[in-house]
Amino acid sequence: FLWNNHLQGHCPASIQLGLQDPKTGGIYSIMTFGKSRFDKNIEYELLRFCNLRYHNVRGAASKLLKAFERAYKPQSLVSYANRDWSQGNLYRALDFTFIRSTPPNYFYVDSKLKTISRIQTQKHKLKAFLESKNLVFKEELSERDNMIGNGYRIYYDTGNLVYYKNYKRQFNDTNN
């Protein structure tokens, strides 16, 4: 579903919630969550949300987030909106708090215009990555210089918007 309907495609998620059409059983919206990847002080991360392509499902994000909140009773939740295509309107509508903008991220593109994540090319992974493609790895070069020397181009996006939701007070108040 995510590969076909989300701009960034699929990413691993331990929690996947969806809205189904009661008549057809088809999925119209999905929201995925996992443990926070970058900040271990935050319990969960909202990883992906999307509707079926060419469909606008009114209230879907709110319904899926409420289902997650009821089932998992999170203490904190973070999400990242790519600034290339989001202004963060959904997060504001879901009562998230804007925390900050991140610096631009980078990625590589090969001669066939395939995008390569910077995560795949971290220095400790780079030798295996390049050798798996029958390319040359030079220990004395940086990640960037190794990639460019092997014909990749580097591109930058505009970074992310970081949104946060704190539930500690909300759930503690309802438990008393």
Regions found by a protein language model. Give the residues of each.
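A conserved beta-strand-loop-helix scaffold within acyl/acetyltransferase catalytic domains
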Residues: 1-106, 113-116, 146-169
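Short, hydrophobic/π-rich interface segment
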Residues: 101-146
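Intrinsically disordered, low-complexity and often Lys/Arg-enriched segments
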Residues: 169-176
